[in-house]
């Protein structure tokens, strides 16, 4: 009974908020106001952050008010910084959001938020697609929705976007189909990857390792798997089953390597690494995955789009995919021949992963990896943020 009353109350509140938002949205735009958001306000990261940082660095040319929209549970990320922020769905947020000239976000906004007519909505998205997305998915296995409803809601939200940032021509064609997007693409490469092409990379790497308390004399392996649509606790909270044998990795690699874990932001697990102290570290809550890319010598992943970003560093990538047949045939499916074209070996056991790690000592880019780089990373030259800002603001 209580839950039904609560649901009705929330539904009424959302309706009222939406009406008020719509009314405020009729007022003139604040032409100098840009609202940023990353992963529904959970992070200060990704493409919105890179665009924000570029604008901050070029204040003389771009005199704008820059404000972040954040989830109240994550305000500690901003409390110790000079970044201006508003708590998502607060009354002040509602006013600023409804009157801002620009929205810059990397994931979908709630459907109940109406986009004012003269607001420019910039969708940066957050990855080069390997697994099928939105309208291209044959079947949706996520909690709290059906395939038809998921696609309908996704496309309704995508219809509000004015600009969509694409990392390459491959992604542009897929986004056009998956999101049914018919407005303006900015095919610029991903702004977030500008960080990986800084001139002072070695100096930056040392600073990051020192700040994170990581041994500077050991090589770093980054393990960054994705989530599984059909393995969840509730809507937006996904399970992760650690199949990779950390004990074996520690026993055979600890003298030379450190392992960093970075779970997907939708995964709810807290991985207990007590037994693997000084070998394995959980940096899932680390706000900026770009820093983890930069300090890592090797990436281990599965079907996560992180490998497209990491490939720009031209370092070894290993794919730990014990469930590849099920994932390919029953969950998402892939846009291209992953098994043939992946820029690294596909491995199904921890033993094979360890063997492959040892082989990276003689790592050389073969024709397959060079071809992959030329298809997916050719726009990543450190100037993507500049391209986006010039397209939007001149």
Swiss-Prot record:
InterPro entries: Glycerophosphate_synth, TagF_C, TagF_N, Teichoic_Acid_Biosynth
GO molecular function, one term: CDP-glycerol glycerophosphotransferase activity
Membrane topology type: Peripheral membrane protein
Catalysed reactions, as listed in the record: 4-O-[(2R)-glycerylphospho]-N-acetyl-beta-D-mannosaminyl-(1->4)-N-acetyl-alpha-D-glucosaminyl di-trans,octa-cis-undecaprenyl diphosphate + n CDP-glycerol = 4-O-{[(2R)-1-glycerylphospho](n)-(2R)-1-glycerylphospho}-N-acetyl-beta-D-mannosaminyl-(1->4)-N-acetyl-alpha-D-glucosaminyl undecaprenyl diphosphate + n CMP + n H(+)
Gene Ontology CC terms: plasma membrane
Keyword GTP-binding: no
Pfam families, sorted: Glyphos_transf (PF04464)
Keyword tRNA-binding among UniProt keywords: no
Enzyme Commission no: 2.7.8.12
Swiss-Prot/TrEMBL keywords: Cell membrane, Membrane, Teichoic acid biosynthesis, Transferase
BP GO annotations: teichoic acid biosynthetic process
Compartment(s) where it occurs, according to its Swiss-Prot or TrEMBL record: Cell membrane
Induction cue: The gene is not expressed under normal growth conditions.
Listed Gene3D superfamilies: 3.40.50.11820, 3.40.50.12580
Reported phenotype of the disruption mutant: No effect.
Highest taxon, organism lineage: Bacteria
Family: Belongs to the CDP-glycerol glycerophosphotransferase family.
Function: Catalyzes the addition of further 2-8 glycerol phosphate units from CDP-glycerol to the single glycerol phosphate unit bound to the prenolpyrophosphate-linked disaccharide. The function in the cell is unknown since the product is not part of the poly(ribitol phosphate) teichoic acid found in the cell walls.
UniProt-recorded name of the protein: Teichoic acid poly(glycerol phosphate) polymerase
Species: Bacillus spizizenii (strain ATCC 23059 / NRRL B-14472 / W23)
Phylogenetic lineage: Bacteria, Bacillati, Bacillota, Bacilli, Bacillales
């Amino acid at each position: 009974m209580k839950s039904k009353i609560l649901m009705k109350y929330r539904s009424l509140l959302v309706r009222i908020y939406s009406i008020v938002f719509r009314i405020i949205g009729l007022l003139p735009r604040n032409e100098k106001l840009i609202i940023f958001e990353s992963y529904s306000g959970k992070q200060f990261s990704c493409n919105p952050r890179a665009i924000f940082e570029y604008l901050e660095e070029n204040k003389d040319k771009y005199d704008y008010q820059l404000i972040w929209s954040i989830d109240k549970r994550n305000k500690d990320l901003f409390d110790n910084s000079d970044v201006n922020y508003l708590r998502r769905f607060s009354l002040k947020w509602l006013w600023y959001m409804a009157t801002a000239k620009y929205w810059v976000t990397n994931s979908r906004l709630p459907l109940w938020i109406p986009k004012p007519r003269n607001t420019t909505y910039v969708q940066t998205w957050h990855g080069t697609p390997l697994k099928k997305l939105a309208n291209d998915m044959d079947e949706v296995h996520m909690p709290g929705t059906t395939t038809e409803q998921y696609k309908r809601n996704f496309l309704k939200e995508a219809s509000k976007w004015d600009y969509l940032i694409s990392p390459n021509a491959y992604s542009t064609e897929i986004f056009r189909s998956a999101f049914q997007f018919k407005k303006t693409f900015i095919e610029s490469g991903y702004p977030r990857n500008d960080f990986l092409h800084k001139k002072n990379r070695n100096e930056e790497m040392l600073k990051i390792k020192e700040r994170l308390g990581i041994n500077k004399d050991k090589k770093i392996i980054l393990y960054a798997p994705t989530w599984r649509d059909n393995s969840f606790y509730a809507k937006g909270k996904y399970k992760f089953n650690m199949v990779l044998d950390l004990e074996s990795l520690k026993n055979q690699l600890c003298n030379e390597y450190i392992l960093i874990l970075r779970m997907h932001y939708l995964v709810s697990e807290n991985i207990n690494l007590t037994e693997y102290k000084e070998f394995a570290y959980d940096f899932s809550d680390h706000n900026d995955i770009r820093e983890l890319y930069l300090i890592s010598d090797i990436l281990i992943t599965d079907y996560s789009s992180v490998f497209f970003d990491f490939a720009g560093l031209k370092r070894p990538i290993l794919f730990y995919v014990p469930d590849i047949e099920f994932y390919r045939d029953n969950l998402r499916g892939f846009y291209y021949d992953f098994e043939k074209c992946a820029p690294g070996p596909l491995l199904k056991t921890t033993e094979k992963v360890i063997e492959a790690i040892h082989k990276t000592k003689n790592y050389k880019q073969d024709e397959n990896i060079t071809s992959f780089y030329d298809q997916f990373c050719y726009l990543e030259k450190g100037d993507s943020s500049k391209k986006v800002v010039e397209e939007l603001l001149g």
